[in-house]
């Protein structure tokens, strides 16, 4: 069984067939907002407020893209985000086509202290890219990616998806670290840090971020980099969406052969101890070219399995040599590691994490893959087709940076554990959340913090998670967003 088949026969098979695949709205012509009456809104502090019809019309006239109200054509499609569990209704949606549009929308929200959510790819697991009764600033039409092959740089719009980035760069024999689900937005993914199958060789996505364009709470359009407003540039590399709306990301690219040694080896769950104990001993010595991470899941027929996903970003002959010990472990159901198009790997999770899935996740940054962690992973395993645990392998180039070099502090983690549940029926919401929380709680003693893109209620406080970077982040937040307009995130409150 190869990796694609494995994924599609586990979580995806039980849920994807019954779910609508929601896609971003197509290009829209300019639509004048015809607000004829005031509408209800909600302030940053949760107080009901009135949004006057004239002000809404003025915003609509100022934007090159449409402003959508409840009942308008396109409103329901625009408000829906990836995670089907979050069904919220903004008072209005500003569908921006330019940085100037974003600045107008930010000014509108700030002047009214209006609750504001930023939708890039709409892939926020906890649903923070949409809000009830506030303003959604929708960047989904700003999805263009341009590649400068001579400079080996990519310029991605704030609404670009990781699939857009991969498509644009791979076409030129170039790549950078991107995530594992192609319909994830570049925006939230990058601002949180950015884990992917190439991070051991190239570092996190933020380590490949050379610059950005951001609209801060004062409505100013800023170009930032290590040379221009370096404190703000430092903060967005791991500090999330706390500091403004990023409308362009400038990425460093690397020469890359998309025909790559990759895939998964799968064993019966009964061999989990042998596999995980081997991995715990083997993984600290991996070369930077080798990304290898375990996962555990149950298929719809009740068969539980453990797998290790592999991507070797280098000479495949050397890669085969490095994989010899892995292939000697146990009696696998299937060895699906082979030469294949990297895009196959980058899209194989898309079905299991399809648009409309009702989903919940928690995560843990783990400093060392210990025997105790192995024991707890086995003891806590939930044999349910709606649940799975994935890992993202760190080390290598991720650890080349110190914990204060960027806002993302977890540089010494060996692994990130991601606990995921997905289901179709709203009646399963409670059990879906409980399974995920219980699994996470059983392994939480091994955690050194969390990846804030997957933050959920009840997670360790933001101050503790950012550790030595928190005070600096709070100072920068106070400078650029003193009113905490951008709070729909893993929030850092201004001083």
Predicted regions: what they are:
Residues 2-495:
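Soluble FAD-dependent oxygen oxidases
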């Amino acid at each position: 069984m190869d990796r694609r088949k494995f994924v599609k026969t586990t979580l995806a098979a039980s849920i994807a067939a019954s779910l609508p695949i929601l896609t971003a709205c197509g290009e829209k012509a300019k639509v004048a907002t015809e607000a004829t009456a005031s509408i209800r809104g909600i302030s940053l502090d949760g107080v009901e407020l009135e949004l006057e019809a004239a002000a809404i019309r003025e915003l609509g006239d100022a934007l090159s893209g449409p402003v959508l109200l409840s009942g308008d054509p396109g409103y329901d499609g625009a408000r829906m985000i990836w995670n089907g569990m979050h069904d919220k209704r903004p008072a209005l949606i500003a569908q921006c086509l330019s940085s100037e549009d974003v600045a107008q929308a930010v000014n509108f929200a700030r002047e009214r202290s209006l609750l504001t959510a930023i939708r890039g790819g709409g892939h926020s697991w906890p649903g923070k890219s949409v809000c009830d009764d506030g303003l959604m600033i929708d960047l989904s039409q700003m999805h263009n990616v341009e590649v400068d092959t001579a400079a080996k740089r990519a310029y991605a719009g704030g609404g670009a998806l990781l699939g857009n980035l991969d498509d644009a760069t791979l076409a030129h024999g170039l790549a950078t670290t991107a995530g594992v689900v192609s319909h994830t937005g570049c925006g939230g993914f990058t601002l949180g840090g950015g884990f992917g199958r190439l991070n051991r060789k190239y570092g996190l996505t933020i380590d490949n971020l050379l610059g950005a364009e951001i609209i801060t709470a004062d409505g100013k359009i800023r170009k930032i980099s290590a040379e221009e407003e370096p404190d703000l540039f430092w903060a967005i590399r791991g500090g999330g969406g706390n500091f403004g709306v990023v409308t362009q990301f400038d990425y460093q690219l690397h020469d890359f052969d998309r025909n790559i040694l990759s895939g998964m080896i799968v064993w019966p769950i009964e061999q989990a101890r042998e596999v995980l104990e081997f991995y715990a001993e083997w993984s600290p010595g991996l070369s930077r070219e080798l990304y290898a991470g375990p996962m555990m899941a149950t298929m719809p027929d009740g068969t539980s399995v453990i797998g290790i996903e592999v991507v070797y970003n280098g000479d495949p002959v050397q890669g085969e040599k490095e994989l010899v010990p892995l292939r000697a472990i146990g009696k696998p159901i299937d060895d699906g590691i082979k030469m294949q198009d990297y895009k196959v790997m980058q899209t194989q999770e898309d079905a299991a994490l399809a648009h409309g899935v009702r989903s919940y996740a928690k995560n843990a940054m783990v400093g060392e893959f210990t025997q105790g962690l192995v024991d707890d992973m086995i003891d806590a395993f939930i044999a349910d087709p709606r649940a799975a645990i994935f890992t993202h392998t760190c080390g290598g180039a991720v650890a080349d940076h110190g914990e204060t070099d960027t806002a993302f502090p977890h540089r010494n983690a060996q692994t990130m554990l991601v606990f995921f549940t997905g289901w179709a029926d709203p009646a399963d919401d409670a059990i879906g959340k409980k399974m995920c929380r219980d699994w996470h709680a059983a392994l939480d003693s091994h955690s050194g913090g969390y990846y804030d893109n997957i933050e959920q209620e009840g997670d360790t406080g933001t101050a503790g998670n950012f550790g030595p970077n928190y005070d600096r982040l709070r100072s920068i937040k106070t400078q650029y967003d003193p009113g905490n307009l951008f709070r729909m995130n893993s929030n850092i409150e201004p001083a």
